[in-house]
Amino acid sequence: MQKKNPKYDYGIHLTLTCEWEKHRFGPVLPLSEVPSLVDENGHFFKKREQLHKHASSAEIEKEMKAQIDLAIQYGLQPSHIDSHMYSVASSPAIFKVYKELENKYHIPVLISKNLYKNTGYDFINSIHETDLTLEQIHMGTFKDFESGKLWEFYENALQNLEEGINLILTHPAFDDDEMKSITINHPNFGSKWRKIDYDFFTSNRCKALLKENEIELVDWRDLKI
């Protein structure tokens, strides 16, 4: 995909948890190398709290590096690194390892006090004044989706962006059998939600709002260290 469309961002979504009911998966490393990261079935834990309780930061470091190395081995030239469920915020030790990946691989990592706070953990010992952070982050809430106002949220976000760098987090996909199966019993961030994301950000309405509000689209390569 990157070879055919090199102008787009292709990041690595580091994954240490798996919330899905039927679409279960685990680490890329052998289980014997990272036993603290998995449940009795060899799958990642469903919740950040479980990761916080059981995971070894040394094993997390090994797994995160393995995921990045594997992606690069497959030919990906990553524009940035972020984290599924922002599970890297599960502890200061884990977050320290995550931040160090930026210097090791010379790839920007997503650091945000707001995302950290959303996990329920305190960032005070993890994010420092010298860290480059992105705080103008916009993401629809469960309430927006459940009240049928997710589309409206995105419209309002584009109409009220603050000056500077803004990041809108979305999960675009089709509301098809595959996505319904993956997200079964998980309506929040489920297939219907993802289809709304896809529909809005490919719509003429979105394009018009970008133009009307003089929003310049940038990518992670513009922020590359």
Please name every model-derived segment.
Residues M1-Y8, T15-L76, H80, S90-I225:
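Terminal accessory/targeting
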Residues H84-S87:
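Conserved short loop/turn motifs at secondary-structure junctions
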